[in-house]
């Protein structure tokens, strides 16, 4: 239903009813889900309208995302050669990602998680290369530019992506402080370009964007909290009062689903 809400925003003028939150916003776009994803998904469906079928636009998107995901997975398998992983293991992994049904099924979905997954694979490979070279890889301007772009895409394609990037960036800055200037650029540049400059420039061009709920960025923590409260009864009264300030405990426990965090985080 996330993609449904995003497409609804793209094609419907303000005010916009956001079904997940049960709220009407006096804006065409809401950043409850990444606006970058909303613009991409909507553009492909719009392109489908131009050629006479929304299905064609969605099919083209699925095709390109499948190719992008396949390329990311293939690159990661090739990178294992650089790490000295034996060829039989590399080939086995390649075969696994090629024939394990959930992977292609996930890759063809028009949703933020599928797009983020492919981006994150590439980001993670770049991160490992920095660790492998003990920070020296950032000395290459080309590599640094690629890392900044991949970091930015992590930030743009999924709300928790910024947390992953910041935490890992601080680790690099502390561990490889010998290259502190490069690691500082690798940390600051994506934040300036994609967390601040992108919204400042793009949001006014599309008519402004309303702020959504904070729970989208904190979904994992909501899910973990609800799981703990369901499985344990040792939370103190003080802890429960603190939790109640950010989530409805009874609703979260009632809606809790072990497979996805949406029911808990929307409580």
Question: Which role fits each region the language model picked out?
Answer:
Residues 115-135, 146-151, 168-169:
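Specific aromatic-rich, kink-prone transmembrane helix
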Residues 63-84, 122:
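Transmembrane-helix motifs of polytopic, lipid-linked glycan transferases
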Residues 205-267:
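Membrane-proximal stem/loop segments at transmembrane-domain junctions that anchor or position
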Residues 143-158, 169-171, 188-194:
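Membrane-interface alpha helices of multi-pass inner-membrane proteins
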Residues 35-39, 54, 58-62, 94-118, ...:
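Aromatic- and kink-enriched transmembrane "portal" helix at the membrane-lumen/periplasm boundary
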Residues 88-91, 133-152, 182-186:
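Short hydrophobic alpha-helices at membrane interfaces in multi-pass membrane enzymes
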Residues 1-4, 8-51, 55-66, 109:
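Membrane-proximal lumenal/periplasmic loop motifs of glycosylation machinery
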Residues 164-192, 196:
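Perimembrane helix-loop-helix junctions
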